[in-house]
Amino acid sequence: MAETITTDVAIIGAGPAGLFAVFECGMLKLGTVLIDALGEVGGQCAALYPEKPIYDIPALPAIEAAGLIENLERQIAPFAAPRLLGRLVTAISGSSGDFTIGTDLGDIVRAKAIIIAAGAGAFGPNRPPLEGLAAYEASGAVQYYVKRREALRGKRVVIAGGGDSAVDWALALCGIASSIAVVHRRPKFRAAPESAAQLAEAAARGDIDLVIPYQLHALHGADGALRTVEVADLDGATRHLEADVLLPFFGLATDLGPVATWGLELSLHHVLVTPSTCETSTRGIFAIGDVAQYPGKLKLILQGFSEAAMAAHAIHPIVHPDEALHFEYSTSKGVPGTA
């Protein structure tokens, strides 16, 4: 059923940055509503990588993506922000202090400011150009996202790619998969230096087979059951890797979707913002997280958290133009609704 909601801030996107924006706005007594095209909160963390380990959240040496979302859910619970999930924002009209947002299900949201936390926008995997790929995708022999590590227990796993996802999953599946081979077309990996060092150590121990420099060439099997992955080196020489599952990690193909039609200044499929406030080219509309772009931008979850705080503070005078904002630490004022 379509809903009509009036609030201070409409947050479009319910990934980590969008969820934390609820907290930052709530601490400034700004009402919020969360809108997301997915049917659950968490963005890619929940939909694609719930068991992926994250190592760069301050004070959390390691946490799975799903655990991070659970913690954020607990953190924002006191603010009871309404949610419009499974809704795609199709239209934005009005101006700073008086926006109207429409969704594909007919919802109407009236807000004084907007925070776009749409991540990469609409996303899907970059698929390798291999003959017969669709049959293996349908059977689960080729997977682009790992939602449950236990589903790969005892499997012969071939991972293709040279970035963080390929390296992190190779390390995470050690001791779970019966064998792990990592195929990369270059001798060096583009992952975080510490992760790349751990991968080299695992290879030296014999826990992981580094197949470099090679690239995917063909899949062999029958009726969707994978038997071997054929790889080729730079000279065209091939070898076969025994495999039950292939995990190609070649990044995501992303599309800003409706965001690109909202009249905002864009650059290379990102929304340009002012670094100190995260405000876009349209007054009253802000962008945070992976969708936002400015000089020196780092695509890190923790930077999205910082941007959420900056945007919330910049929004306060829009919602309360006659009220001075006195900065306070959370240790001083506490969190509303908590003991």
From Swiss-Prot:
Coiled coil: none annotated. GO terms for molecular function: ferredoxin-NADP+ reductase activity; flavin adenine dinucleotide binding; NADP binding. Its EC number is 1.18.1.2. FAD binds at D36, Q44, Y49, V89, F123, D290, T331. It catalyses: 2 reduced [2Fe-2S]-[ferredoxin] + NADP(+) + H(+) = 2 oxidized [2Fe-2S]-[ferredoxin] + NADPH. Binds 1 FAD per subunit. Its cofactor is FAD. Keywords: FAD, Flavoprotein, NADP, Oxidoreductase. It holds the Pfam family Pyr_redox_2. Belongs to the ferredoxin--NADP reductase type 2 family. PANTHER family: THIOREDOXIN REDUCTASE 1-RELATED-RELATED. Homodimer. HAMAP family: FENR2. This is Ferredoxin--NADP reductase. It comes from Acidiphilium cryptum (strain JF-5). The lineage of its organism: Bacteria, Pseudomonadati, Pseudomonadota, Alphaproteobacteria, Acetobacterales.
